């Protein structure tokens, strides 16, 4: 059994373990070792695992820290059983929204167990989390990561699309890590932020927000 570990608290962590037989030569060429990260201009294997998330911040979130989260794991590798594990101290109301190419998904406590996952399978999960941390002086931080796709002692390329939304002009983006570069496309507006990433390694994104006056 393999696991996808997800912690939406001070951070989100997704770790996907894959089988060597399911990895293309293009993907293997970009494997990186422990402690390394490489951002890529393009995804070497367009059919490989993709992670998507949408975080909705309400005005009440600034006091409660509670946000709405929608996550999707797409183009999964074939495997008999996989566990998606969430941080039990931060998470509530886990619900499977949709799934395809998966025989069964069981929600219990802070985990979702998937059975008989077919190649290319997908699952989308909705939840709430106390994930918005107040830093004082009107500053807030969201951390997403580490995101990774493991192969033995290395990391394979993957893509992540992360969207963050809030009421118009409620918050202003102060800083993002990583910053815009090859493999990191960032779009910012008065009501949200979107990050598209292509990378190999263990990636953590940080978003610093300030409440608008």
What feature does the model see in each segment?
Residues 112-182:
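Surface-exposed, acidic/Ser/Thr-rich flexible loop segments
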Residues 10-20:
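Bacterial N-terminal signal peptides
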Residues 32, 78-107, 154-183:
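Solvent-exposed beta-hairpin/edge-strand motifs
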Residues 1-6:
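N-terminal secretory signal peptides that target proteins for export/translocation
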Residues 44-45, 56-66, 85, 116, ...:
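Short, solvent-exposed beta-strand/turn "edge" segments of beta-rich domains on protein surfaces
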Residues 95-143, 190-204, 208-212:
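A surface-exposed beta-strand-loop module
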Residues 17, 25-60, 195:
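N-terminal, polar/Ser/Thr-rich
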Residues 67-75, 125:
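Short, well-ordered beta-strand segments enriched in hydrophobic/aromatic residues
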């Amino acid at each position: 059994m393999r696991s996808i570990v997800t912690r939406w608290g001070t951070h989100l962590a997704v770790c996907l373990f894959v089988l060597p037989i399911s990895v293309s030569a293009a993907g293997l060429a970009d494997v990186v070792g422990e402690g390394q990260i490489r951002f890529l201009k393009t995804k070497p294997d367009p059919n490989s695992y993709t992670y998507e998330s949408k975080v909705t911040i309400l005005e009440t979130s600034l006091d409660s820290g509670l946000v709405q989260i929608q996550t999707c794991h797409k183009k999964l590798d074939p495997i008999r059983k996989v566990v998606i594990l969430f941080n039990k101290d931060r998470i509530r109301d886990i619900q499977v929204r949709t799934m395809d190419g998966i025989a069964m998904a069981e929600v219990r406590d802070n985990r979702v167990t998937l059975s008989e996952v077919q190649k290319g399978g997908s699952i989308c999960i909705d939840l709430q989390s106390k994930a918005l941390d107040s830093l004082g002086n009107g500053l807030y931080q969201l951390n997403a990561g580490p995101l990774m796709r493991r192969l033995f002692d290395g990391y394979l390329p993957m893509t992540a699309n992360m969207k963050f939304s809030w009421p118009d002009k409620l918050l202003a983006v102060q800083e993002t890590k990583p910053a815009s570069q090859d493999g990191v496309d960032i779009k910012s507006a008065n009501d949200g932020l979107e990050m598209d990433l292509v990378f190999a390694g263990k990636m953590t994104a940080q978003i610093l927000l300030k409440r608008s006056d």
